[in-house]
């Protein structure tokens, strides 16, 4: 592992260094992947080039090279994709950049050289250099009428005893100007929001639009699976109020507390399918934490896994994430397919990376998805936003929650 030192600083300083390096890589013609925030014990993980390719879910995050860093995603609906980085740059708490991966230290490895150049540039310019600006997107207003109908349908299903709660999603749409590069726009869109909102975790994957693999720019605050060897945690989010309201309101809300506890039970069930007997535990219940534009209720469930359980097997047992489906899970998934007018795509799936025995995935919420329209050839940008529905939900209240969650994505930074 190689190192290149720089001074330590605030969270904003770390973010600035990471986003400046990401912008430099894109400007130089690379296809980088980035994890910014708290990932794998570092403040940022950057790869200069990751060629994402479609793969079967059973092969996701697998590689014959035990030292490989694998970036990828599993969509809620659609085909999984991943790609291997020959080396990565890791930003530590003390402000030191570390290099890791099979190509580290190889002077003839172009990815290692690209990372060195981008980090040198970032160290020298991050405090003074403005990030590239993304052309403003003209988002539609979302299908409020259909969403509110789905809320009513869900409440009827709850009253009939079919489900206890579900997570209903809606999608917002925009189109990229013909003159814009999709990768450059996505990188600028992502970096500007990471710089402004300082999310705890954010993820960027370069995609391959010509192969039908989307570019993903995610501000998701929700950890799906965090695995270190045989230990795993899942931290579902359920319960939301706008950021301008007192956070303790969440703990006084019967609806939000009930949402969270029901999903915690579902997470315990999911992990219990593959965990060692007796090891599934709720280690944190109903913590109030901030996220861009909102306050959320978080809970954490931990477990111990068998030694030989693969990353793909763990994901399969817990997918789709509990918080974006409902209880009971299978019936909720069936009903959501009927109620939602569009497939979710990457929204509500999983995004992140794996390295050896470590796996870190976020739930792909608060995520912009760049795809190519097969008919017009234009690049579409979509953002899915969802929320938990219980018997205490109202259509108007749920749409207000959608708007609060969507604002950091849809409003110009």
What are these regions (language model features)?
Residues 1-413:
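Extended alpha-helical targeting/anchoring segments
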């Amino acid at each position: 592992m190689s190192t290149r030192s720089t001074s330590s600083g605030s969270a904003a300083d770390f973010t600035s260094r990471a986003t400046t390096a990401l912008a430099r890589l894109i400007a130089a013609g690379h296809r980088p992947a980035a994890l910014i925030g708290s990932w794998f014990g570092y403040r940022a993980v950057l790869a200069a080039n990751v060629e994402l390719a479609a793969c079967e879910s059973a092969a996701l995050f697998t590689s014959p090279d035990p030292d490989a860093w694998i970036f990828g995603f599993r969509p809620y609906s659609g085909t999984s994709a991943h790609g291997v980085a020959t080396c990565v740059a890791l930003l530590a708490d003390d402000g030191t950049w570390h290099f890791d991966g099979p190509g580290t230290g190889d002077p003839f490895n172009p990815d290692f050289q690209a990372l060195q150049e981008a980090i040198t540039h970032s160290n020298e310019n991050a405090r003074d250099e403005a990030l590239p600006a993304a052309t403003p997107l003209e988002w539609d207003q979302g299908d409020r009428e259909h969403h509110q109908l789905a809320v009513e349908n869900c409440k009827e299903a709850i009253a009939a005893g079919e489900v206890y709660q579900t997570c209903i999603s809606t999608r917002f749409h925009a189109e990229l100007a013909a003159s814009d590069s999709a990768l450059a726009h996505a990188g600028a869109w992502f970096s500007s929001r990471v710089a402004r909102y300082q999310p705890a975790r954010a993820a960027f994957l370069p995609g391959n639009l010509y192969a039908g693999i989307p570019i993903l720019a995610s501000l998701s605050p929700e950890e799906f699976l965090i695995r270190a060897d045989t230990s795993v945690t899942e931290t579902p989010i359920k319960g939301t109020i706008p950021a301008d309201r007192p956070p303790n309101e969440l703990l006084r809300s019967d609806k939000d507390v009930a949402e969270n506890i029901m999903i915690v039970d579902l997470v315990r069930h999911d992990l219990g399918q593959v965990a060692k007997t007796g090891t599934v535990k709720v280690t944190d219940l109903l913590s109030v934490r901030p996220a861009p534009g909102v306050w959320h209720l978080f809970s954490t469930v931990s477990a111990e896994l068998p030694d030989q359980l693969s990353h793909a097997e763990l994901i399969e047992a817990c997918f789709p994430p509990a918080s974006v489906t409902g209880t009971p899970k299978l019936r909720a998934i069936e009903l959501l397919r009927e109620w939602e007018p569009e497939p979710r795509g990457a929204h509500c799936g999983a995004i992140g990376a794996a390295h050896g025995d470590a796996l870190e995935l976020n739930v792909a919420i608060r995520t912009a998805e760049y795809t190519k329209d097969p008919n017009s050839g234009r690049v579409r940008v979509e953002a899915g936003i969802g929320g938990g529905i219980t018997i205490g939900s109202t259509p108007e209240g749920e749409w207000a929650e959608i708007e609060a969650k969507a604002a950091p994505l849809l409003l110009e930074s």
